[in-house]
Amino acid sequence: MGRWALDVAFLWKAVLTLGLVLLYYCFSIGITFYNKWLTKSFHFPLFMTMLHLAVIFLFSALSRALVQCSSHRARVVLSWADYLRRVAPTALATALDVGLSNWSFLYVTVSLYTMTKSSAVLFILIFSLIFKLEELRAALVLVVLLIAGGLFMFTYKSTQFNVEGFALVLGASFIGGIRWTLTQMLLQKAELGLQNPIDTMFHLQPLMFLGLFPLFAVFEGLHLSTSEKIFRFQDTGLLLRVLGSLFLGGILAFGLGFSEFLLVSRTSSLTLSIAGIFKEVCTLLLAAHLLGDQISLLNWLGFALCLSGISLHVALKALHSRGDGGPKALKGLGSSPDLELLLRSSQREEGDNEEEEYFVAQGQQ
């Protein structure tokens, strides 16, 4: 009887993990193709991103309210001094990362976007070394060389290569390295109380919106104000369809973050990292099949080389965590509370610093 119960529990956990991974795939791959599809007819990616931020803030606030009502515990609200001094740098880097990524969809294919964004792990490692979150090891140098070499091979003599778009997405990957490093440092400040990702999202979105607004005003403000799709609309039906499409993108963006957090809280950040590797493969295969992206043998070899570097990085993180009994923490880091999300019963399985390791792993997403 005990063995049967154990088998059932194992099977249930496997089915649950598979379901959460598939949910994450639906949102992650879905928003990539959705944004690419939307920017073909709506050429205002920065405005699109800002609307997504507003939707994410709305749903984050709603999630906090639901958790507060169910737990009868007040959610953390930072003072203005802490908010502007400690959260603002992370919010600005995050806004530029997301904004430039969506902007690049005007010029690059999904396959080139996916491959180049995978290189964010490279920049995360570099900035982690600069901020002394990682120690320089020969294995890390190998990871950097594999990812950089793979990126070079994927873009070398690519028939659908666009310099402007590649510069945008590579810039986003570079800023993404700063973003996730700052996010890790932000979460390690236990006194701020932002270990719960829903609270982090709630506090980041307003500053992200404000940080992206000047870029929007310079590059899209005038054109959008004269566009018949938004402000000078003549067809109410067209306006509602455009706003509905943008709002749906915001729901997908929040769903992506929520599914990531749910997967981590029910399994581990290692599961998310491994799932992210296979997600990149699925994205490229779908891009070649559905959108007709042209990927040569050399490009595939470069992609495989890059994925091997990412896989090595994930394996090193897993071994390092097991060897030290958990991810490396900065001095003064206290125990992190459980991820509550909307499911208060969700318990962590990877130790008190799971959110910290999770955000570092997100560079490949």
Swiss-Prot record:
Q: Which residues are glycosylated?
A: N102
Which residue stretches belong to region Disordered? 344-365
Which Gene Ontology terms of cellular component type are present? cis-Golgi network; endoplasmic reticulum-Golgi intermediate compartment; endoplasmic reticulum-Golgi intermediate compartment membrane; Golgi apparatus; nucleoplasm
The record ties this protein, via CDD domains, to: TPT_S35C2
* Expression sites by tissue: Ubiquitously expressed although the level of expression is tissue dependent. Overexpressed in ovarian cancer.
Membrane-spanning parts = 14-34, 42-62, 104-124, 136-156, 158-178, 202-222, 242-262, 294-316
**Record's subcellular location:** Golgi apparatus, cis-Golgi network membrane; Endoplasmic reticulum-Golgi intermediate compartment membrane
What are the UniProt keywords, alphabetically? Glycoprotein, Golgi apparatus, Membrane, Phosphoprotein, Transmembrane, Transmembrane helix, Transport
Membrane topology summary = Multi-pass membrane protein
Upregulation: In hypoxic trophoblast cells.
Q: Which residues are annotated with the PTM Phosphoserine?
A: S335, S336
Similarity field: Belongs to the TPT transporter family. SLC35C subfamily.
Query: Its function?
Result: May play an important role in the cellular response to tissue hypoxia. May be either a GDP-fucose transporter that competes with SLC35C1 for GDP-fucose, or a factor that otherwise enhances the fucosylation of Notch and is required for optimal Notch signaling in mammalian cells.
Q: What is this protein called?
A: Solute carrier family 35 member C2
The scientific name of the source species is Homo sapiens
